[in-house]
Regions:
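Extended, charged alpha/beta regions that create polyanion-binding interfaces
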Residues: 1-49, 53-55, 125, 129-135, ...
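Short nucleic-acid-contacting surface segments enriched for D/E, G, S/T with interspersed K/R
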Residues: 94-109
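Conserved glycine-centered short motifs in functionally critical loops
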Residues: 69-73, 116, 122-124, 128-138, ...
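Generic structural signal for buried aliphatic residues
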Residues: 57, 108-110, 178, 304
Length: 417
């Protein structure tokens, strides 16, 4: 991206992570500052739910609900979690040999894969995963699988497969599965990918080897701070600078980059101008405020109304102040196409997920409708989080689904205010 910056700001209660491109905010997340040190958290004291993502716990099963094929368990005292039993992966029990059943009182190794959202508990899985910049290691599922990101084309996959034809990687695949991430497309030689996989394999081995000696509610693994993993997980071509005005965050980021992304270290900058804050330099307060408002204006004069609810998000497209001289059909077509691009941006920026229903301005021509769906799908493919156009209903409503990973931006900001 042109003139793109990943900005980290340390506030009183949270760390802001902002992806800015040509002055526009593309992504924003607010991460609460930890209330306790790592040692206290590791002992299983109740922590902030938003800090759990990716962490591995020895959870205790409270009850199994057969009619929904799921179990509810505790990660720490008072912190419940939801475990679907549809996953065919065999759970790793620490209190007894697994006999095909999961029972109340069982102590099971789980990893948090989705944060708590509103009234819903965090979602955990028994299929553990360890993420690096180029690969994800799955040490507890069916071994031997080599899976490539759907965004990697066939020619790229062929090159990457060649990089993996090494004895060390074959040994890893005998006990684990691997997912090769989209970031691997940047590689021109295989050593960074191989070293990334071997580092993950060593980490997984260390954690699994001590799991049997840990007590219930123990936290065996807590990944690097979420704002740091964004550096690793954001595609390298999406930013040309990593900027912070906090010496503490700068040092944390420097150490993280040296270990996991040495090629990105030159992008890290410490902003030190006392005359104007980094927040004011880019007008970030106003941009964050706009990212939580209900109405979003389009350049054409049209606007979106974005209304999240408990069950889904509804987006209404309106012609608003549009004063063009084009025919009605062309007017509606142009506003809808502009709205499609802005909707894709807003979903990513606000971190809206689940079911999204969009009420575009009515169009009669089937070719215009097809063009709109194709344009919306094309825009959504730019989102690092999987987002899919499902269909247009007979009433002209467009249904989108977006994978739930983190909570909406409004919730993140409200929690930390």
């Amino acid at each position: 991206m042109k003139d793109a910056k990943l900005i980290f700001l340390k506030q009183e209660r949270h760390i802001l992570s902002l992806l800015l491109c040509e002055g526009r905010l593309l992504e924003a997340n607010a991460y609460p500052l930890p209330a306790a040190g790592p040692a206290e958290e590791a002992e299983g004291t109740s922590g902030n739910v938003s800090c759990l993502l990716g962490s591995i716990y020895v959870g205790k099963v409270n009850n199994v609900v057969k009619n929904i094929n799921a179990a509810f368990l505790e990660l720490t005292k008072g912190q419940r979690a939801f475990l679907s039993l549809d996953n065919r992966n065999e759970p790793r029990l620490l209190n007894r040999p697994y006999d095909g059943r999961l029972l109340a009182g069982d102590e099971v190794l789980v990893q948090v894969e989705k944060e708590a959202v509103k009234t819903k508990d965090p979602v955990v899985t028994t299929e553990l995963s360890f993420s690096g910049r180029y690969a994800v290691l799955l040490p507890t599922g069916c071994p031997g699988r080599l899976i490539f990101s759907g965004k990697l084309d066939n020619s790229c996959r062929k090159i990457l497969k060649g990089f993996l034809e090494r004895e060390e990687i074959k040994n890893v695949l005998e006990r684990s599965s691997l997912i090769i991430r989209t970031n691997a497309s940047e590689l021109t030689e295989g050593e960074p990918l191989v070293q990334d996989i071997l580092r993950l394999d060593s980490l997984a081995g260390q954690i699994l080897s001590v799991a049997g000696t840990r007590t219930c509610y123990s936290c065996l693994y807590r990944p690097a701070s979420a704002y740091l993993t964004e550096i690793r997980d954001t595609y390298h071509d999406q930013y040309d600078a990593i900027v912070t005005d906090s010496p503490d965050l700068y040092e944390e980021a420097r150490l993280f980059l040296e270990q996991q992304c040495p090629g990105e270290l030159h992008k890290l900058k410490l902003y030190q101008d006392p005359s104007v804050t980094l927040m004011n330099l880019y007008g970030l307060s106003a941009k964050l405020r706009e990212a939580t408002e209900t109405r979003v204006w389009l350049k054409s004069g049209g606007y979106l109304v974005i209304e999240p609810t408990e069950a889904l998000t509804v987006i209404d497209v309106n012609s608003g102040k549009y004063s063009g001289k084009k025919a009605i059909r062309d007017t509606f077509r142009l506003i809808n196409l502009e709205a499609a691009a802005e909707i894709a941006r807003q979903l990513r920026l606000r971190n809206l997920s689940g079911i999204i229903i969009v009420d575009f301005i009515n169009m009669e021509d089937s070719a215009d409708k097809q063009e709109l769906l194709q344009a919306l799908s094309r825009e959504l493919r730019q989102d690092p989080v999987k987002a899919v156009v499902v269909d247009m209903t007979p009433l002209g409503l467009v249904e989108i689904t977006r994978k739930k990973i983190r909570r909406p931006l409004r919730e993140q900001l409200n929690e930390t205010d």
